Each structure stands twice: as structure tokens, then as C-alpha cells.
UniProtKB/Swiss-Prot annotation:
SUPFAM superfamilies: Nucleoside diphosphate kinase, NDK. GO terms for molecular function: ATP binding; metal ion binding; nucleoside diphosphate kinase activity. Its EC number is 2.7.4.6. ATP binds at residues 10, 58, 86, 92, 104, 114. This is Nucleoside diphosphate kinase. PANTHER family: NUCLEOSIDE DIPHOSPHATE KINASE. Homotetramer. Belongs to the NDK family. The lineage of its organism: Bacteria, Bacillati, Actinomycetota, Actinomycetes, Pseudonocardiales. Major role in the synthesis of nucleoside triphosphates other than ATP. The ATP gamma phosphate is transferred to the NDP beta phosphate via a ping-pong mechanism, using a phosphorylated active-site intermediate. It comes from Saccharopolyspora erythraea (strain ATCC 11635 / DSM 40517 / JCM 4748 / NBRC 13426 / NCIMB 8594 / NRRL 2338). One of its GO terms (cellular component) is cytoplasm.
């Protein structure tokens, strides 16, 4: 069954020139790009996107980071797209949890600056896609 997920290449990934690498891995996995956009994230969108973390000690720094530079947002589609991209991304902590061969395992060094975001469930994907691409 085909599903959709939101993928973000965060400001650190854009700044380091890793957008092509991330997109290439998505396409080589057999997933399809449905929408793709380079944008500066506004505070309101950042707050809505990370609403589940509101009140946590790292919330402010998370918002500061995601709004610090351009982000590439994409809607990716394919069989098991959510879990397929999360496998490509690797664990949230690039050093302790991300497997070598994953995006974070190959290129990441810090938990907060972990290059990419992928929706973690069908419910999250639906909510996040509506936030980032309301026209879809």
C-alpha cells in the first residue's frame, strides 16, 4: 500500500550541501517525490510542526535551529514510505543510534543538528503534510 510522508532537510543539511545526497537516497530507495520546496521556516510554522515538544527544555533551541536557515521540505510517496525514509534517515542521535550507511550515521554528529526529519507515523505524516503543503 502506498503512503505519504513529510521529509525535511534541516538547515544544517542545506548549509552543508547534502540536499542532493538526501534526495538521491530517497529516489534510489524507490520512493517518489510528490512535492519539493526550499523555504525559510517562519516561527508559527515551526511552533505548529514541533507542538508536541512545547514545554520541554529543548523546545526553544529546536525552534531557533529550524528557523535559522533554509529548509527543503518534501512529500515523499511509496510503499511503506514512512518507515522506509526513517530507515534511510537513521536514529535520531547520529553518533549513538544511527547505523552506518544511514543519512545521519554517515553525516551527522549531534542530536539537535541531525540533518533530516521524517514523519514518525501515518497520523503525524497527515498532520505535517497539511501544515507544510496545505494545497495537497
Amino acid at each position: 500500500m502506498s503512503e505519504r510522508t513529510l521529509v525535511l532537510v534541516k538547515p544544517d543539511g542545506v548549509e552543508r550541501g547534502l540536499v542532493g545526497e538526501v534526495i538521491g537516497r530517497i529516489e534510489r530507495k524507490g520512493l517518489k517525490l510528490v512535492a519539493l520546496e526550499l523555504r525559510q521556516v517562519e516561527q508559527q510554522l515551526a511552533e505548529q510542526h514541533y507542538a508536541e515538544h512545547d514545554g520541554k527544555p529543548f523546545f526553544g533551541s529546536l525552534l531557533e535551529f529550524i528557523t535559522s536557515g533554509p529548509v527543503v521540505a518534501a512529500v515523499v510517496e511509496g510503499p511503506r514510505a514512512i518507515s522506509a525514509f526513517r530507515q534511510l534517515a537513521g536514529g535520531t542521535d547520529p553518533v549513538d543510534k544511527a547505523a552506518p550507511g544511514s543519512i545521519r550515521g554517515d553525516y551527522g554528529l549531534e542530536v539537535q543538528y541531525n540533518l533530516v526529519h521524517g514523519s514518525d507515523s501515518a497520523e503525524s505524516a497527515e498532520r505535517e503534510i497539511k501544515l507544510w503543503f496545505p494545497e495537497l
